[in-house]
Amino acid sequence: MKKIFFIFFLIWTSLSVNAGVFDKKNAFLKAEQAFVFTESQQNDRLSLNWDIASGYYLYKKSLEIKGENGQLFIPQLPLAEIHQDDFFGDVEIYRHQLTFSLPFTQLSATKQVEITYQGCTEGFCYPPETRVIALTSLERESGQISSAVLKEESVLSELPLAEQDRLAAKLIESKYAVFWFFLFGLGLAFTPCVLPMLPLLSAIVIGREQRPSTAKAFGLSVVYVQGMALTYTLLGLIVAAIGLPFQVALQSPYVLLTLSAIFVLLALSMFGLFTLQLPVSLQTKLTQYSQQQKSGVFGGVFVMGMIAGLVASPCTSAPLSGALLYVAQSGDLFTGAITLYLLALGMGLPLIFITVFGNNILPKSGNWMIQVKNAFGFVLLALPIFLISRVFPEIEMPLWFSLAFAFSLWLLYQFRNNKGVWVFTFILGVMGYLYYSYAMNRHTPAHQTTSLSQFERITSYAQLQQVLSKNPNSLAMLDLYADWCVACKEFETHTFSDVAVQKAFTDVLLLQVDMTKNSEANRELMQKLHVIGLPTLIFFNQQGQEIEGSRITGFMQASPFVDWLQKMKSIQPISQ
């Protein structure tokens, strides 16, 4: 068993070490070298030119020219080439060179234009590039851009992406992104939301009067994983297509509390307090039906796999968020289904290995199984604590401490004749108590109340624009919050209440929108800001404009969040 875990550990760590296969920094040109941009203003026209390196191309649909007030200018573009893209299908592109011009009469309502474009090459895509051109001189030298603009672009280029955005970008860059989802799934298999599923599957396969054969154990585990894979595939497609309304239903406190109650019952049954079973009469009928149709047991395992997929979904981590973001950006439902299926298959592979190999390694049934069953009960109790704490964060630490204390007492009883275990457990208990005391003092309700009181509530997009216009010299952060959003509560409890974060907030305008009711004003604001789900944090500069590449669309711990804020602030002194 240890060898199996070691193999999976090597696979996951090698994936992290070799993450550079996505970048290929030495194999590709820098964006400014691949797409050499120049501009000139003469003869009452603004001329734009891109010299495109061999093997590289620009997307026609990515070209966008905006004025300082956000108005769009539509240029007359030359005929584009049709290209079969790995992710977007048939797209129009430009190779070698792109040149066009705009008359100043068309640009008379603005003093500057913002030009956005994006290019790719085989197996690699660049993030969108933006150039700002001031229209103050008709004889401006070709390619000249203000130092302030260059400085801002330099700062933005160094800005770290959020974890889910960084993952999505790497996946889109990779030609074989679909297959990488399988490896990411292996990593997700060891997250707190998936790990508790291991004893549940073991109970299905091993916890029978007669242990199933290796072939049947393999079959049960595969069917279980297929049920989980189906759930994740459908979940990903629904989230990508619907967004917020589905999040509302799935992350509702009622759903989380119901799931928690189910796992508490399962844990109590594993402690032997009672046996969960159907009435004898119904069991007899089901047994007869099962004998007539051999797939009955497998069908039940398939349904349990689907349920396991739903249980894990509220605890979506950054890699899964990146996967969903990738599906949303690809726009291809078939590709999205395949990628998320492989993600779930990777998550289920460790379950299959543990079930099959564990079935042969474990000794015959005996008293040891009672101890294992009780231990699994403690593991099952961890998941409801994890879920309940997202609805009632103030009781998270007391619940974890209570579970750890109960497990320690049980462990000491099992090894009551082993002094070494007593000493080791005592040391762990002292360390756990010290950490508990520290955590309780660090995240008190007073701290949380203070952090929330700093936010100014926004109810509409119009009000947001008005507030931003009255604070032109402040960095503003907009927090899209909802009571049903469990990750939003994590931000409040673990991030916003942190002392270092509170200190970093001193010169930041803090705004918050309550999206709980999903009202018409909420939907309008989401549409205007292009928000697909919660939590979402958006940063605005001193002009009230969103800072490009600065969004946070998933939970972030306090330390990296402080670094993020410092990066945002480093952009603010720039004046154009």
Curated annotation (Swiss-Prot):
Residues 199-229, 275-295, 358-367, 416-419 are cytoplasmic. The keyword Signal applies. It holds the Pfam family DsbD_N. GO terms for biological process: cell redox homeostasis; cytochrome complex assembly. It is found in: Cell inner membrane. The gene is dsbD. Residues 20-177, 251-253, 317-336, 389-394, 441-576 are periplasmic. The chain crosses the membrane at residues 178-198, 230-250, 254-274, 296-316, 337-357, 368-388, 395-415, 420-440. The keyword Aminoacyl-tRNA synthetase does not apply. It is a multi-pass membrane protein. One of its GO terms (cellular component) is plasma membrane. Required to facilitate the formation of correct disulfide bonds in some periplasmic proteins and for the assembly of the periplasmic c-type cytochromes. Acts by transferring electrons from cytoplasmic thioredoxin to the periplasm. This transfer involves a cascade of disulfide bond formation and reduction steps. It comes from Pasteurella multocida (strain Pm70). GO terms for molecular function: electron transfer activity; protein-disulfide reductase [NAD(P)H] activity. Disulfide bonds join 120-125, 193-315, 485-488. Residues 1-19 form the signal peptide. This is Thiol:disulfide interchange protein DsbD. It comes from the Bacteria. PROSITE patterns: THIOREDOXIN_1, THIOREDOXIN_2. It catalyses: [protein]-dithiol + NAD(+) = [protein]-disulfide + NADH + H(+); [protein]-dithiol + NADP(+) = [protein]-disulfide + NADPH + H(+). Coiled coil: none annotated.
